[in-house]
């Protein structure tokens, strides 16, 4: 057990999925040719005035509602002054003293324990552009400049990389379930800065924190935190903490698995915040507040409903609500008539178990209606579970219709009791000696009889075979 305690706070930048940018009317589409979606406001040209996007404010209110945070009806935008090539105005429009979203909290589960992580604030700001470094040149793409961001700042309440990842995954699911962001980490819609420090256990003092910048995958976030903790502990134990652990911003080298120094960490005073004179103070009227606080069912609420109403186990309910796509697929199966238990098994075990590489629920070729039909045919006794797996393999490889495949593959079960009884009587008659042994106490022979009936019937319903065979054997 380590003699040190890890202190972690996270700042997450969520790109809001508005159709236009936060302070102008340019499109926010990803992947367009460089500098296509720009205007005088994006470019920071003299005389261009920002106009606040109402939809961005509404989405911020929705997030605050989801985490039970204070919503500040009055807030102010401020200029955050710094120079960087992808920031054409030489300042970023952000919020400082009065953010739209105040204190809230997010509950996580980690290592079979529940913990509440405080959220200090969430404020709106504009994104910067993007620097592209090629050979001896650096290029600037300002398509992303002025895109709306919601920066969510946690309290330093996390004590391990596992807790940090649990918090991030929960936050990721919240913004996805709210529908305020696609939270695509590969495209930069969900980016994280981690603030990491250590201290001897039992010490209440907060020591030097190091910021690790722009992490965009759960895997790399965890590795970056773990490396940084090890680096700081090693420096402490070697007596080099004061010289090697300084307040700075570091980058994570994904190839080497280490963090390296990028620049000294600025304090708020270094940014010289002041209210933006081009933007009026924000007042959230009753109509906008009413729209913002109206949110869909959140992951925790959905999980409780699955447990209490559908009778699912907590673990299974947690798996289904860990992803918006999974939850929607599952509920669509229920709407098509599949049972909760059948939908759960065939979605999470059979279908997901067959997804490999880049194949996803959206690209696997089996939609929720098709899988629900397969589940219903099994539950109706028309086919066996084994046959269902064969059909699912074909569906994923070639597609098709469940009922047509049942017929063409000859997988329909025999459910006619008369036909099954005839086969049972034939098997028992041909094995009279074994029937006598069974009746004298050799119960294991029951499996032999079942096997013979299944073999001779070529597709009898196993459940009915068991029931009718027991009746015949007495």
UniProtKB/Swiss-Prot annotation:
It comes from Helicobacter hepaticus (strain ATCC 51449 / 3B1). NCBIfam families: gatB, PRK05477.1-2, PRK05477.1-4. Belongs to the GatB/GatE family. GatB subfamily. SUPFAM superfamilies: GatB/YqeY motif (SSF89095), Glutamine synthetase/guanido kinase (SSF55931). Allows the formation of correctly charged Asn-tRNA(Asn) or Gln-tRNA(Gln) through the transamidation of misacylated Asp-tRNA(Asn) or Glu-tRNA(Gln) in organisms which lack either or both of asparaginyl-tRNA or glutaminyl-tRNA synthetases. The reaction takes place in the presence of glutamine and ATP through an activated phospho-Asp-tRNA(Asn) or phospho-Glu-tRNA(Gln). One of its GO terms (biological process) is glutaminyl-tRNAGln biosynthesis via transamidation. One of its GO terms (molecular function) is glutaminyl-tRNA synthase (glutamine-hydrolyzing) activity. It catalyses: L-glutamyl-tRNA(Gln) + L-glutamine + ATP + H2O = L-glutaminyl-tRNA(Gln) + L-glutamate + ADP + phosphate + H(+); L-aspartyl-tRNA(Asn) + L-glutamine + ATP + H2O = L-asparaginyl-tRNA(Asn) + L-glutamate + ADP + phosphate + 2 H(+). This is Aspartyl/glutamyl-tRNA(Asn/Gln) amidotransferase subunit B.
